């Protein structure tokens, strides 16, 4: 039996896990790292890059690179890369395809089945789009699991809590979910969920970038896409620096801007006040839905990379009136939980008795007549939010008027009284024979499965007619044949080979730093990159050593750029910056530096 892979398909980063050796194990990518940036780029030759190299291209080729597309899953938004347009689910499929390749390389066998996590507040269209993305990437999607549920599984598996009431605060790059979880015996019961699908760490990046632009007296509309890409990247670096320090220097070096300014945590609190306000709303909602007070929560668990921000932790400590807030590997915990779920699906003896009960995060219903205002249709709720999954409920309705011959069943998701304020999911047109309305009952059943996908059944007892539909975005829905055709199409896409991935990353990283620097340092970077290209082209026995050398060299240059340090030429030119653990490795570095100098003399004269 092939392994089932658990996947955290994130807004900023994605990663995978597998149940192995009686535990959930993270799967490394080609760099030996667990986090793969959820970024896709296409070059002039139509070759697709996914992950670290694609992320570097955000600054150098912003119009050929896409990120944060998870926020638009289930919509018809298009990203134009290379010579074609991609839907968010197609870009996600490329990320999932990359994770599949990494998993197969790590396990040494083919894998086909996956469990993919989604934000609890993803609507039905986004969930269906996620499932299609997995299928297009070549996966058989065993289950769609809510991210907080996966996090709860990981926590329960790690801590073996006998009884606890947890609040899981899942704050990632692009989404926020807040859940109440009841743990007892081997049961994990999700009690209530609330969230915001358009709030995440990326919003802090955007606000820091906006603050910097205004402080420099610039107009964002006059800046090139390349410059905006550099500013956003520097804003993210500034945010990360503020994780460790009270203040951070934000430095932007590129053709249009050469400036630096200090930003403090207090500054972020002030200009991101709206973000913190939005963070508080789901917390209040989930406590109300769970009929529970702050004092009754035994554990608060932080999930998602954005929870590493001290300001987020301080805000939660204030709102929840406690200081014992846990961060259990925020970047990895969802993937680890998906790995546990994979172990349960495989019936592994260590976890086969664990039971996860999930809930429906939204209310679902249909539009009905509003006698008080015929123009404004009301929402008739069939499934209320926080109902346990799987869940099925039937309501009986009647036509609007006597002798009506057609009924339009309009299906909505949301909590508002009026359907105009809720999300339209789909519509069923039903033909009925003319009769008195009281003699023409229409039975409507909603069934919400464990993947959070809605199925609607309609029965007309008077005629025996039955209609059924699975809610999908009709504009984007695909038949099985269309999915298979798309799978074959994606198999033909030229992906950057895994063996070239590190080389491409070094080139993209170096190209971005080259663009950010000026003068002698820029020339030095350019020549190092030319030398690296030379070594790659001839596939020399030195290549691995040169890769290692370039990674350290570019890391030092990155530090110089970020800190706005004005170093002397010798600080970066003589190789003394390269520190290694052993004398042998230090000697290796000197040899590579000498080889570079010899190559440089042969290819550049003194006048350049």
Indicate residue ranges for each PLM-predicted region.
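Oxyanion-binding/catalytic loops of NTP- or PPi-dependent enzymes
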Residues: 1-75, 79-85, 94, 101-608
